[in-house]
């Protein structure tokens, strides 16, 4: 009996040793490759500053919102002040129980419009549409029946006027030059179908007009630990996966997509918890099955700031949703693994 227990413990010990060696090697390679790529991008960015670039890809920014009346006006103000020339902002109110839509309508002096929305991907029907042309950037609010974040994003895709769209969270803030940065991979390579941005923790960071006024680590220990986690992931692991077109996720907080390819792939899946990851895996599958030359890229200098949970209960809910979404995506698209 004791020999069986000793044998089992030996196997477990060997497994953990192999796992630690493998994971440490992965982290080491991620840091090395990430450092090299960041240095190359820094040199390339210095060169681009001296080159004229007057072309701007037209982009639709889609912001799904549910019960965001407190923060949504500030979010929209920050989006309307981005350093970019050709874009529109679409806020999709997913059946909020508060005054999300009314707050926006009053704050931006919007008026009701009646225009058909072509359902290229399925979504719940709209209740009303408001627009404003008093801003320098076209701004639209769509109120629809509740169907979840993925359904709201599908509505935004259907309503978007431009061939490229960005999805982001209502509580996130894009850095002022983020659109200029995230379009670069698509301008450099016509085969790019999606680009992920760099998501950073905004807790205790002072932002003004899309720029960092004062940066400091969060006072909350849990949020501070997430800063290290995010930087390790976005500045190391994702750069490594980007080298061989292996990115399996673009954060729902900030990602750029080609609308025609997303529509052809079926849009966002409303039945999964991780709609952002499921879409990227689905794009890989769709492009592979249809023998398309494609790549999914990652822009390390296109920055989005987001709030991290500071309570353990909130972090638990977030990570549970992420891991269940990962499991659902892998099961649904296990054929490409």
Question: What is each residue range found by the language model?
Answer:
Residues 57-60, 88, 263, 278:
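Cell-envelope/extracellular polymer assembly enzymes that use nucleotide-activated donors
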Residues 77-142:
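Acidic donor-binding segment of Leloir-type glycosyltransferases
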Residues 261-266, 272-298:
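A short, conserved alpha-helix in the catalytic core of glycosyltransferases
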Residues 113-140, 145-154, 158, 162, ...:
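Long helical/loop segments within the catalytic core of UDP-sugar-dependent glycosyltransferases
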Residues 1-13, 17, 239, 244-246, ...:
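Basic/Trp-rich segment in TM-proximal cytosolic loops or flexible interdomain/linker regions
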Residues 165:
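Short aromatic/hydrophobic "clamp" motif used to bind/position activated sugar donors
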Residues 1-55, 238:
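N-terminal membrane-anchoring/stem segments of glycan-assembly enzymes
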Residues 30-86, 102-105:
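N-terminal signal-anchor transmembrane helix
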